[in-house]
A protein has these predicted regions:
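Expand to "…catalyze enediolate/carbanion chemistry for C-C bond making/breaking, isomerization
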Residues: 2-349
Length: 349
């Protein structure tokens, strides 16, 4: 993972004296999916230390602290909360990262962007020290190779329906002889453009491989998928699952929920078998009928609670609705209220 790419441009051949990294307690605003305030500990962005004339030498890695990977945090029992980025806007990616999400999924399956646009989003996320996951347009070795060369911390393969497809997905992530991934590790962002000499020995331990199950056929094979060596997470896809069952855009249908619960239990059964003997973590999307706190109680380890476009759409619709309602009320009342309530939630609030 290219965690240091953001900092290398300001480092020179001269010696450096590193500054310790400090942390800030951030109180997050109330989420549309969570009822209570949440707090996180987030490292302050590191500023390149000044150049000093000294005989002490340091390496680039000495000037930063390396946060735990998503994979490590899952193994430590954390529940991670993230966002899907469909706009491919680096600005929205950075805002999401600074807001405190544990991860951001850059969605190449349903978003309009390609590799170049995804790279810009990964730069923005790296600047805010937030892990990126890339969801591929399809489970394909060429797409996987190009995405992995960008250096995301995780990769998600859509529409995995059986053990064979899951094994192929894992093979796309590993170099020969363990897989079929093409090698250009000396010049790609994933290895800090060849500067990270430990990339080849570490990347398999750090990369989070996610297989998305989103069909009735996939649910039937979900335990086999979860037990494939190298599959770290099984991501549930309730919308496509409902469509495959004949209930398009109705993931809250009773029959869809029953199948989804069966799938969840199948994945969790493999998780309980322990990391040494295989098994995967359970991840999924929150829905209006299935809120994040309910998913956490059912055993989900990774939860995506929102989509950037959806959040922006809802904010816009609510903003226009509020203004239109004020116009309607003004028809019966000529007095204009210039108080605080009229300016609430505009600009900075």
């Amino acid at each position: 993972m290219a965690t240091l790419a953001f900092f290398t441009s300001s480092l020179h051949h001269k010696t450096l004296t590193p500054k310790p990294t400090s942390q800030t307690l951030i109180h997050l605003p109330k989420s549309p999916n969570f009822k209570s305030l949440t707090s996180i500990i987030k490292p302050k962005p590191l500023i390149s230390p000044p150049i000093r004339s000294t005989t002490t030498t340091t390496t680039i890695s000495d000037t930063t602290t390396t946060p735990q990977t998503l994979k490590t945090r899952l193994k430590n029992g954390e529940t991670l909360y993230g966002l899907f980025l469909l706009s491919f806007s680096p600005t929205l990616a950075e805002i999401a990262a600074l807001s405190g999400y544990d991860f951001v999924v850059v969605d190449m399956e349903h978003g309009p962007g390609g590799i170049v646009e995804a790279l810009a989003c990964l730069h923005a996320l790296a600047a805010a020290r937030t892990p990126a996951i890339i969801r591929l347009p399809e489970s394909d070795p060429a797409w996987a190779k190009k995405a992995l060369d960008l250096g995301p911390q995780g990769i998600m393969f859509p529409m995995i329906e059986n053990q064979k497809m899951a094994k192929k997905a894992v093979s796309y992530c590993k170099f020969p002889p363990n897989g079929v991934r093409g090698s250009a590790h000396t010049v790609v962002r994933a290895s800090d453009y060849g500067i990270d000499n430990g990339y080849l020995s570490n990347y398999e331990d750090e990369l989070l491989i996610m297989c998305q199950v989103e069909s009735e056929e996939g649910v039937k094979k979900i335990e086999e998928i979860a037990m494939v060596d190298g599959v770290d997470c099984v991501q549930m896809g309730p919308l496509d699952l409902s469509a495959s069952m004949g209930y398009l855009w109705d993931p809250g249908h009773k029959k869809v929920k029953e199948v989804l619960r069966t799938a969840e239990k199948g994945v969790l059964k493999t998780t309980e078998k322990g990391r040494g003997g295989g098994g995967a973590f359970l991840s999924g999307f929150a829905m209006p009928h299935d809120r994040p706190e309910e998913m956490r109680l059912r055993g989900y380890h990774m939860i995506s609670g929102a989509v950037d476009i959806g959040l922006f759409r809802s904010a816009c619709v609510e903003d226009v609705k509020r203004f239109k309602s004020l116009l309607a009320s003004d028809e019966d009342d000529d007095e204009v209220d210039n108080g605080k309530d009229g300016d609430e939630k505009y600009w900075s609030e």
